[in-house]
Amino acid sequence: MTTLDLTARSDRGRVYWLLADCWNIVRRGLTHYQRQPVNIAWQLGFPILSVLLYGYVFGSAMKVPGGGDYKDFLMPGMFVMTMAFGFINTATLVVYDSTKGVIDRFRSMPMASSAVVAGRGVTDLITACAELAIMMLTAFAMGWRPDGGLGFLGAFGLLLWLRFALIWIGVWLGLLVPNPEAAGGLFAVAFPLTMISSIMVAPQLMPDWLGWVAMWNPISSTAAATRELFGTPVGGDTWVEQHALLMAGVWPVILTLVFLPLAVRRFKKLSR
């Protein structure tokens, strides 16, 4: 009979084992994708379908304030929408692990609770990079031509920054909902929240009250900031529109400060 040597973990620093535990969770998540290629194919295929569908269906039917090509306006919004919808996949994977007993096994191991949560987040961030790369290549093939250089890299970083913040909402919700079917129902909540934003239509073209809500939607700030960095700024008259770059950095910080502790606390509560 073998026993688990817990003293070995005390020989090294807490940070080391936190990172080691986090990496084990990341490796487990990536291996899961490798063994179930259908899941990753769908996760990477949906962004392509979104770009093609919205790009060709709405590409010549919508107007942009101040003129300009709607495709240049739409593509950054589509990138933001995919990052926003990603939290549903996070929640679904977390609740799937919970119902299959995987979370119980993690709780029985001598590993940090925060490492389990963080490992899920890092895994999803890696897949988000792949999603963005595929979407941008598809958009480029459709004729989208952003400005290159630091602006392009900055926009890519802001998109991942938003995804990073929304991951913790997905983890928290995944630990709350009872089954994967209920997690799938989160789409009914996410869809209107993403539509009431500037990802497809400028808030100036909405009714006044709805436009005000859309302007203060965190998704709108990231959409406006990425458009500016990609070289197709839209602008606006309100403070939040004129400071889109600032708010695109601030909103994810607020969301992370709120939902990351909630996710870790919920995981610890399950351990009691």
Curated annotation (Swiss-Prot):
Disruption phenotype: Deletion of the drrA2-drrB2 operon decreases by 33% the daunorubicin (DNR) titer in cell culture. The drrA2-drrB2 mutant is more sensitive to DNR. Deletion of the drrA1-drrB1, drrA2-drrB2 and drrA3-drrB3 operons almost blocks DNR production in cell culture, suggesting that disruption of these operons impairs the efflux of DNR, resulting in intracellular accumulation. It comes from the Bacteria. Keywords: Antibiotic resistance, Cell membrane, Membrane, Transmembrane, Transmembrane helix. The keyword Transmembrane helix applies. Induction: Expression is repressed by the HTH-type transcriptional repressor DrrR1 in the absence of daunorubicin. It is a multi-pass membrane protein. The chain crosses the membrane at residues 38-58, 73-93, 124-144, 156-176, 182-202, 244-264. GO terms for molecular function: ABC-type transporter activity. The complex is probably composed of two ATP-binding proteins (DrrA2) and two transmembrane proteins (DrrB2). Belongs to the ABC-2 integral membrane protein family. Part of the ABC transporter complex DrrA2B2 involved in daunorubicin efflux. Responsible for the translocation of the substrate across the membrane. Confers self-resistance to daunorubicin, an antibiotic produced by S.coeruleorubidus. This is Daunorubicin resistance ABC transporter permease protein DrrB2.
